[in-house]
Every structure is written in C-alpha cells, then in structure tokens.
Amino acid sequence: MTISRQFTGLTLAGLFLGLSLSAQAFSPSVQTGADIRRTGFGVPHIRAENERGLGFGIGYAYAQDNLCLLANEIVTVNGERSRYFGPEQLTVEERENRISDVFFQWLNTPQAVNAFWQAQPAEVRDLVEGYAAGYNRYLAERRQQGLPQQCQGEWVRDIAAEDLVKLTRRLLVEGGVGQFAEALASATPPQAMANIENNARAYQLADTRLQRFALDRGSNAVAVGSERSFNGRGMLLANPHFPWVGGMRFYQMHLTIPGKLDVMGAALPGLPMINIGFNQHLAWTHTVDSSKHFTLYRLQLDPKDPTRYLLDGQSLPLSKQTVTVQVKQTDGQVVPVSRDVYSSQFGPIVQWPGKLDWNNQFAYSLRDANLDNDRVLKQWYAMNRAGNLKDLQDSVHTIQGIPWVNTLAVDDKGQTLYMNLSVVPNVSTDKLARCSDPRAGLKMIVLDGSNSACAWDIDPHAAQKGIYASSQLPQLLRKDFVQHSNDSAWLANPAQPLTGFSPLISQDGQPLGLRSRFALDRLATLSKKGLVSVQDLQHMVMDDQVFLATQVVPDLLKFCTSQSEAALKSVCSSLKAWDGRANLESGVGLVHFQSIMQAMQESPQAWRVAFDPKDAQHTPRGLAIEKPEVAKALREAMLASAEIAAKMGLTEKTRWGDVQVVSSGGQQTPIHGGPGTLGIYNAIQSVPREDGKLEVVSGTSYLQVVTFDDKGPHAQGLLAFSLSSDPASKYSRDQTEAFSKKQWSVLPFTEQQIKADPQYQVQTVRDDLEKTGKVAAQ
C-alpha cells in the first residue's frame, strides 16, 4: 500500500490531500512474505528477507491474536465511533464517542497524516505498508471462517498505511494534548457557554482519567552494570506499567531480517517494530518521564471580540477549523454534526470549566511538542538495529524521536545508560520566571500568550524547532547501576545526581516516589550482600513488598494498642496479621492499609519525619501519631476502611487473591501486586466491581530480565495479560495464569532455541493474491 501525492488538476486540496487507500498497491510480480514461528504462549518469531515482508508478517500475526482490538482502535483514530456506535457510548478510555471523534478528526487531518508519511524513510514505509497488507490478508481469511463475535460489524474493514500513521500520532500525543480531548472538543466562545454546562459528564470523566493517567502509564527499570552484576555483563529489568486493554496494550514478538535485524521484545498496537526489548548485544526499556511535553499559553483576549487575542499589542483572530463527525441517531440514520475547533498561533484552545476558562478576558492555548514529532518510528527502528550501546545512544541523540519516556539500557560489555532524552519544550528557567503564571505552579506550565518573547526558544542543534537539543538533556553512563520509576532524572543513581535543568526537563530536590525509594533501598541491600543476580531482579517485582508498610506499620500498630472500639479492633487485628506484601495469600490487612494510607498521605503533617532533600531516599517516613490531629485523622481513616471492607463483603479470612482479579472469557484469574502509590514495585491498578471485587485495568505488562554471555542474550519474561485479546484464543489467559503463579518464561532467541521449543510451529505467509500460509508441524 502506498501513500502518495495526487494531481487532480481540479482543486489545490488534491495536491495535499491525495492519499491512496489501496492496501496492496505494489507490483504483483514482486512476492514478499514471512515465516511466523510460534513458541510457548504463542509468541511469534517473525522472519523475512526485507522490511516489506517483515511488516506483512507482523500485521498478519497481530491480526491473528488481536484482530478486533486493532479494528476498534482504527475506528477510534479515524474519528468514526459516533458513526457506528452512537455519540454517547464510552471508549475504552472512558471518553464519550462524540468527544473522541471531534478530537481525532482534528488531530488526524489528511494534511497532518500526509506530512508525517512524507517524512518517513523507505524502510519505515515498507514496514508500515507491509503491516497493513498482512493485517488485511488475515482479515480476508478470517471473514471466510467467520469473524469473532466482538467485531462482526461494518466497522471492521481493510486498513491502509494512513490508519497506522493515525495510530502512531495518537501515541505521540498521549503525554500532551491527548489528555485534553474534552477540553479541546468542547471549547466554546463565551456567548455559547450553555454548551459547556451540557458537557458536565464528559468533564467529570476527563478529570478522573487525568488523575489516573500517571498510574496507568508508569514503569520501573533497573540497569545493572559490570561492577554489580553476577557475571560482569550488563543486566536489565524492564517492568513497564501500561493498560491491560485498548490501544496501549503491549504485544510480544521477535523480528528478524537475516544479516540486518534480530530483535525481541514488545510493541504497542499498530507498530511494526519493538518498543522495549533486546538484541544480540544490548537490551533497553522505557519509563514514562516526568518532563513536560506541552505548555499552555494564557491568551489576553481583545475586549471587543473573545475570538480575537492580543499579541504584542496587535489584535489577531483565532483560526477556526470546522470538524464534521458522522453521528448515528437512535433511529439508525447517520447525520453529519459539525463542531468548530479554535486555535491561536500557539495551538488549539482548550477549555476546562473552573480550571481553564474561556471568558471575555482570557482563553488558553495548548502547544504540544510531539505534534511535530515525525521521527518516532525511525527512532525505534534505529534502536532495534543498534549494534552496541553507543549506536543506541547516538541514534537517540541524533533523531530525537522518543516522545515522552526515559530510556534505560545495558550492553554485553557491562555498561549501563540512562537517558531523559525525550521531546521537551525549550523553555529555560529564566524564561519560565519571566513568562509563567506563578499561580499555576510547575504541575502545569502556563506561559504568557500576549508576549511573543514567551514563545519556545529555537536551538539550531535540536531535531525540531522549539525543543531542547539532546545535548541539553539529562543522561548518565555508568558501570554500577541506573534505575528509574517515573520520578525526575535527579537520582537515577544517587552517587551522581543530575541537577540544574529547566523544571520542564527535570526537577531536583523533590520527594521521590515510593517505588523509586524501594528500588534504591533494595539495590543498596543487594550491594551489601554481594553481586546482583537474575533472581534478585525478578524478586524486586515478584516478591510484592509494600514499601510504604516498612515506613509506617510500626506506628499504625502502636496506635492500635490504645484503641478499644470493636470496628477499630477488627482493622487493627487485620493489620497485625498482614505480611506487609501484596501476594495472593496476603490478608485483608492490605485492603485496610491501602484505604488508611490513601487518606493519610493527603496530609503533609501526618509524617513524623518530613521530607529532607538531603536524605530523599529515606524521607518522609513514620506517622506522627502523637499529634492529636494526626491521631484523629487516623482513627477516622480506620473507621472508614472498616465500612469499605464491610460493603465489599470482606472478612478477616479474605485473601488478596480473592479480591483483585482479571476477567477473560467468563473466567477470573487472581492477580498479585497493587497500587504503586504504596511503594509496590509490581504496580497494579484495579477498579471496584459491583460484586465487591477489584478488576485489574492496568499495571505490570511486559516483563523482561536480560543478561548476556559470550554467545549473546539470555532473557526471561512474561506478558502479564497474555498475547491475545480474543477471549476465544488459547493465548488469551495462559501467560496471565503464569503471571498469577509468578512463573517466568525463558524467551527463546537463537534459531536453536526457537526450534527446540516444545510448542514450536511455523506458518509461511506470502504477500500475493494466490497463496496463503498454512500451518505445518515441525
């Protein structure tokens, strides 16, 4: 399938918008294809002679396992959900269809998609076009058999390369304007404020989702070097925390082009390359960073017209883009509904009642640095092919395509690398002091939109206008260790703090998250005992220690000794019996601990030892139970927890595995782990169900521990939610059950390992109209 500019001779738009929708516009005489070799848990090892064939194999294999998931995401990123499912149904991300459609119609215009495509190198185009063709081949075959029950509508269709570009652009803005879809789609000039009131439900959902964003997209990573590893080689733990459903659900695979590419790991839907993984000489992972990837601009509006703004004293009109969404009515008819999206020269207007109001005096524009990032696919493919750590580092320095994550890596020589080299707006500390609204603080950067001097600075050495050059961003190369769990770059290794950066890049002197404190504490303990082993890294995740419990449980139990109320005694008894972990067999004390500490952590006065930037690894800690106000708050939190447990139907005999589960195909699997906010490294987010249980929605996803010897990599891993999202697939629960039992799997990488796997089978798929692949037992 190709995307190309078309001359129609009739309209200027044709020059820019002509996108071929044919998914197989290639010479029929050229036959490409791939071998899809599956091993344990169905993991595909895809081998082809070139990128087109490799992409074909990836798309085919992915469709075998996740046909309906990708079909659904394609509808979403094309802004067509209201057309097929009605305007008020919620997406997987709990966003109303009508809001989602307006946002994606605005984001993925033909001009934007075509510009992205034109920037791609030939190898990336071949991968993407091959992926679309492979997906379509399997879809055609599956139609003959009958489509899965969950995707038997007209919305399931062949895809094209531009659909995959739209998926990629959605990924890019996850850390920016993607969090403000409601605010963008509903922004209305002051005369029409009634429309805002009608969107109260949408904003409530958006507010909840925004608060949960960091929890759903976190990660842990530890890279151990030659000075600390058991064999003097590099060793990497990758533990990304991502959604278990939808368009951010990882897929496990191994990609090979003989003599050019050999890489294994996991990728997000629609991406024909590995995001997190390893090859012959190195392993890498990502953690969601704390850097800013967008800024807001507060516009000073023209007193005569709220659709005009003042810039350097000159009145300028807001541009207006009319977005038309096809909407299915209750009678089944589909009618067009139009919506205007307003923008200043800084970006789209976003309106959030009570937070970002558009009135007669001010409005807010959002500028997302990743909207101009067309380098992300090129970046990951270069990382996939890196022959050593320097190659990987150089590619990230040069391409600057990493959108909103840190990179941690190791090599077979024993080096470790940390890079906070993502796409960050170039706003210096001095400019921030001159241009930002101090009332907004540093959580959300708000710059002065009436002064052109407050625009992002331009560094000629950066890969993109308005972002920091890679040489100005934090990075660390060491031989002992680097680690990260979604804090700033500051203490990736406490022996060499990274300081002095713009607050948009990294803030030092701030409290560490509890997962970071756990990791630093565990690594210090391991260092005292000796060298770090593979099992040590596995245990960091799988022993499910609740780090916060080590800091406060003694105070909780001391408080309990003075309590006599029956409800409090029950809570205290559970806390005393609890093992301080989030294992399946851990007691109901974990539920009480979570409820109590969620309430207590909201008060800085609750800590007995306050945060000290000179001792960030060990503070804050302890509960100041001797303070009357803290004792009162603690008592109230315990009573509230007793009520919650009663409503959930929990007793002192309840175990954590009875409470937290994941459902698939009518079956439930108990899941260990818990909230990362409690310092549980194996971070799992779950939401209440009507039956009193908690349903897992995100958290530990793809797990890998990789080390090396003279022959290459040795890896163990798991995909916690399993390979397939189809409940009918035999690969939909198998790895989930293994994860529940804490059973790691050896990841076969060499040809000998792959073919020796007891579950080995191979399917050859050809990219032509005549032949289809057949499964052959080997």
UniProtKB/Swiss-Prot annotation:
Residues annotated as the enzyme's active site: 219 (nucleophile)
Signal sequence extent: 1-25
CDD domains named among the record's database cross-references: Ntn_CA (cd01936)
InterPro entries associated with the record: Ntn_hydrolases_N, Pen/GL7ACA/AHL_acylase, Penicillin_amidase_A-knob, Penicillin_amidase_dom1, Penicillin_amidase_N_B-knob, S45
EC number(s) given by UniProt: 3.5.1.97
Miscellaneous note of the record: AHL-mediated signaling mediates quorum sensing in many species of Proteobacteria, regulating hundreds of genes, including many that code for extracellular virulence factors.
Assembly mode: Heterodimer of an alpha subunit and a beta subunit processed from the same precursor.
The name this protein goes by in its record: Acyl-homoserine lactone acylase PvdQ
Species name: Pseudomonas fluorescens (strain Pf0-1)
Encoding gene per record: pvdQ
